[in-house]
């Protein structure tokens, strides 16, 4: 990668050709932005790998921050400043006749949050990386996290902000880390090969949760953590028949369509619950699987992870990790509960009764029968 202005200019012009098949002078400004963004992302790749290796090799304890929103804003300038390459890029682009500020304006605000809850989560991730701690975020990869305000015929209207329309240069899709999340169906008990009574979910609607990883770059310290965004795709397991496949696809699309669906209808309220479970189930399954791969055991997971739940939205993480440990990994109730009570933490944002979430028993028992049993 580049370490000076001359190397930067050479790399920038080369990438214009390799990415778009044309000289830099023929690239559109959005293409120039994408070239710069991918250069910055690739610049931190070695530090990203080193940070992961350090955690794995030293068996470090990690924080995983679950939040329905992360108001991270635009990342281009922040990432270049944290990497210490902003001035090199600015001067190199200027020599090429490109104003870096024009490229900065091409970046969309990430549609992952819209308020103080999301800004707090983003600040935590930024601070954790800059302090050199291994701490990561988990969120949904919303298609439309924001609304844009426009004036049409003299009136203010809100329209969806299609922030992913021109791609997100910071994310890397990781299909090999996909997990299966199950909704509906029924919980049944059975006897395993050791004669123990276990539970499992059957006849469920299965969704494949696919992660997209975004680097969270610490300030000039070579530490790079991860914000993992989950997207819903059709599962290869238990696909519905052609007659109901369209409804299945619609259900998948709804999961990641937007932040905080309208809860004035029953459908909207159930969708919120589905989103919340989708996030925590995908994130926890991924963490448990990674821990087993690194450590070869699960009885010490509470010594290696702490899961921070940002407000009430990810609270289903508590019964879900119980389900994962008991149903999928053979833990008894007391063993699982010991792990859970030593690795779950919660941030409360209000004590107003009307702002605290409550779900009808029928919603949880129908949508998540096994989780309902555990609760």
Give each language-model segment a name.
Residues 1-375:
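A conserved ligand/cofactor-binding region detector
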